[in-house]
Swiss-Prot record:
Short sequence motif GAS motif: positions: 452-454
Stretches the record annotates as Disordered: 501-531
Disulfide bonds: C118-C202, C180-C187, C296-C375, C318-C371, C322-C369, C331-C353, C333-C345
Species this protein is from: Rattus norvegicus
Role this protein plays: Does not exhibit measurable stand-alone pH-gated sodium channel activity but may form pH-gated heterotrimeric sodium channels. Its activity could also depend on alternative gating mechanisms.
Pfam families: ASC
Subunit text: Homotrimer. Heterotrimer; with other ASIC proteins producing functional channels.
Residue numbers on the Extracellular membrane side: 90-438
Protein name: Acid-sensing ion channel 4
Subcellular location(s) of the protein: Cell membrane
InterPro entries registered for this protein in UniProt: ENaC, ENaC_CS
Side of membrane Cytoplasmic, spans: 1-68, 460-539
Length: 539
C-alpha cells in the first residue's frame, strides 16, 4: 500500500534580504519584520574618524607590516599625549602663583599712618602706692611694704583695679613729650590717643580713621618728628626676675593703618635713648589669592560677630580676639588690652593664669590662634637708620633748657622721625600663574601635536561607543521568544535553529532521511518569483 507524506507549505513574498543575513542566528521565520540596521563596525568608524592614523591602523584593508607600523605609531603617540596631559594636570593642581609689583604714580597727598609708641617700663616707681606694690608684687618682683618697712603678713588692701593702676602709674605722655612737629606744624600730647597693650599704657598718633592726617610731601620734615624723655629714673628696680622683668630702656614703636589695632609686643621695633631714629616708610597695597591658590581671608567672610569692637578684619584684631577667648575660657576674665566688656583680671591672675595662657598659644598655622591674612591688606614698609644724639654743644643746651645734666640727656632723650620716602604706593598682587584656560590650551596643543584630535574627535568616539552600546542593549531587550505549537493544530512558527533540531515529518514508508525536510531550507515555490524566500512551514 503506498505511503504518503502530508505536509503544508506556505510562502510569502518579501524583498530579497542580503546574503549575509541568510545564515542568521535566531530570527523569526514567520512574518517577523527585519530590525533596524546594525551599527557601524570598527573598521567603518576608523575609516571615517577625524583621529589621525586611526583609519590606517584599524580601517578596512589587508593586514600587513604597513598596518602594524601604523598601529605602533598610533599607540606611541597616544602614550606620549597621555604622559604630557598627566604632567600638565599635575602642574595645574599645584596651583602655582606669581607676584606682580606695580609702582603707582606719585599722588599729591597721601594719608599718614598711625604711629603707636610705648615706654618699655610699664609702671613708674614713684607713682606706685603701697597697695599697688602689694598687688603687683608677682608682676614687678617688688616685695610688699608699708610705711614701717617690708611686712607681707597682715596687710589688707582694697581690691585692685587694673585699669586704674595702668592709667595712674604708667608713663604720662605729657611728661615724656618734649617736642612734637608734623609736616612743619606744632603738635602736642592732645594729638595722641591712649591705647592699652601688653606694655601697659601706650599712645597712638593719628589714630582716627575718619580724620587721618595727610602728608603732602615725602622726605624728612614732612612727617612726624618727636623728642621724648623715657624717664629712666622711674624704671622699677629689679629685686628678682619675673616674666615681666625688662632689662631694656627705650620705647617700642609700631607703624600701622588706622583700621588695625596695635600688636606692638610682636610687631613693634625698638628705639633707644641717645639716638635720633629715622623711619622711612612706603605704603604697600597687598592683594593675595584665596583658595585654592592661597590661604587669605576673602572679603565675603569678614562680617563675623567674633571681631566685635573692630571696624575691619586684620591679623592683629583676629589674634587679640582669639587670645581674649582663650583667657576668658581658662581664667574667666580678660586682660586690659583685650576688647570687650568682660571683667578685668586682677594682678594676681595676670601672672598666675593669663600670662601662662598667652604663652601657650601658638602663632603658626597649626596653633589655635591661626589668623589668615586678609586678601586685601595695607601695610607700611620701613627702612630704619639712626645717628647718635646729642652732640657736645646740644647736650649743654638741652641740659639748660630742661634743667637736667648732660648725662641725663644722653641716657634718656631720643628723637623719632617718621616720614614717607615718597608719595607713591607700591602695589603687590598675587596672580594665578597657571589657570584653567592655560591648561585647556596646552592640552589642546598636545592633543593636536601627537594624535591630531580635538574636542569634536572625542565626541565622535563617544558617539560611536553610545551607538554600539545602545544596539547591544536593544538586542537583549527585544530577543524574540520561541512560540510553541498551538493546541488547535494551527501553524506554528519555528526558529531556524529549532527547525534543524526538529525531527523530520512522520514518514509513511520512505526510507530514513528521504523526507521533505532536506528540501525545505532552499525550497522555492515553482510558480513564485525568483526572489521569494521560505517563510512558513506546517507539517
Amino acid at each position: 500500500m503506498p505511503i504518503e507524506i502530508v505536509c503544508k507549505i506556505k510562502f510569502a513574498e518579501e524583498d530579497a534580504k542580503p546574503k549575509e543575513k541568510e545564515a542568521g542566528d535566531e530570527q523569526s521565520l514567520l512574518g517577523a519584520a527585519q530590525g533596524p540596521a546594525a551599527p557601524r563596525d570598527l573598521a567603518t568608524f576608523a575609516s571615517t574618524s577625524t583621529l589621525h592614523g586611526l583609519g590606517r591602523a584599524c580601517g578596512p584593508g589587508p593586514h600587513g607590516l604597513r598596518r602594524t607600523l601604523w598601529v605602533l605609531a598610533l599607540l606611541t603617540s597616544l602614550a606620549a599625549f597621555l604622559y604630557q596631559a598627566a604632567s600638565l594636570a599635575r602642574g595645574y593642581l599645584t596651583r602655582p602663583h606669581l607676584v606682580a609689583m606695580d609702582p603707582a604714580a606719585p599722588a599729591p597727598v597721601a594719608g599718614f599712618p598711625a604711629v603707636t609708641l610705648c615706654n618699655i617700663n610699664r609702671f613708674r616707681h614713684s607713682a606706685l602706692s603701697d597697695a599697688d606694690i602689694f598687688h603687683l608684687a608677682n608682676l614687678t618682683g617688688l616685695p610688699p611694704k608699708d610705711r614701717d618697712g617690708h611686712r607681707a603678713a597682715g596687710l589688707r588692701y582694697p581690691e585692685p583695679d587694673m585699669v586704674d593702676i595702668l592709667n595712674r602709674t604708667g608713663h604720662q605722655l605729657a611728661d615724656m613729650l618734649k617736642s612734637c612737629n608734623f609736616s612743619g606744624h606744632h603738635c602736642s600730647a592732645s594729638n595722641f590717643s591712649v591705647v592699652y597693650t601688653r606694655y601697659g599704657k601706650c599712645y597712638t598718633f593719628n589714630a582716627d580713621p575718619q580724620s587721618s592726617l595727610p602728608s603732602r610731601a615725602g622726605g624728612m620734615g614732612s612727617g612726624l618728628e618727636i623728642m621724648l624723655d623715657i624717664q629712666q629714673e622711674e624704671y622699677l628696680p629689679i629685686w628678682r626676675e619675673t616674666n615681666e622683668t625688662s632689662f631694656e630702656a627705650g620705647i617700642r614703636v609700631q607703624i600701622h593703618s588706622q583700621e588695625e589695632p596695635p600688636y606692638i609686643h610682636q610687631l613693634g621695633f625698638g628705639v633707644s635713648p641717645g639716638f635720633q631714629t629715622f623711619v622711612s616708610c612706603q605704603k604697600q597695597r597687598l592683594t593675595y589669592l584665596p583658595q585654592p591658590w592661597g590661604n587669605c581671608r576673602a572679603e565675603s567672610k569678614l562680617r563675623e560677630p567674633e571681631l566685635q569692637g573692630y571696624s575691619a578684619y586684620s591679623v592683629s584684631a583676629c589674634r587679640l580676639r582669639c587670645e581674649k577667648e582663650a583667657v576668658l575660657q581658662r581664667c574667666h576674665c580678660r586682660m586690659v588690652h583685650m576688647p570687650g566688656n568682660e571683667t578685668i583680671c586682677p594682678p594676681n591672675i595676670y601672672i598666675e593664669c593669663a600670662d601662662h595662657t598667652l604663652d601657650s598659644l601658638g602663632g603658626g598655622s597649626e596653633g589655635p590662634c591661626f589668623c589668615p591674612t586678609p586678601c586685601n591688606l595695607t601695610r607700611y614698609g620701613k627702612e630704619i637708620s639712626m645717628v647718635k644724639i646729642p652732640n657736645r654743644g646740644s647736650a649743654r643746651y638741652l641740659a639748660r633748657k630742661y634743667n637736667r645734666n648732660e648725662t641725663y640727656i644722653r641716657e634718656n632723650f631720643l628723637v623719632l622721625d617718621v616720614f614717607f620716602e615718597a608719595l607713591t604706593s607700591e602695589a603687590m598682587e598675587q596672580r594665578a600663574a597657571y589657570g584653567l584656560s592655560a591648561l585647556l590650551g596646552d592640552l589642546g596643543g598636545q592633543m593636536g601635536l601627537f594624535i591630531g584630535a580635538s574636542i569634536l574627535t572625542l565626541l565622535e568616539i563617544l558617539d560611536y561607543i553610545y551607538e554600539v552600546s545602545w544596539d547591544r542593549l536593544k538586542r537583549v531587550w527585544r530577543r524574540p521568544k520561541t512560540p510553541l505549537r498551538t493546541s488547535t493544530g494551527g501553524i506554528s512558527t519555528l526558529g531556524l535553529q529549532e527547525l534543524k533540531e526538529q525531527s523530520p515529518c512522520p514518514n509513511r514508508g520512505r526510507a530514513e532521511g528521504g523526507g521533505a525536510s532536506n528540501l525545505l531550507p532552499n525550497h522555492h515555490h515553482p510558480h513564485g518569483p525568483p526572489g521569494s524566500l521560505f517563510e512558513d512551514f506546517a507539517c
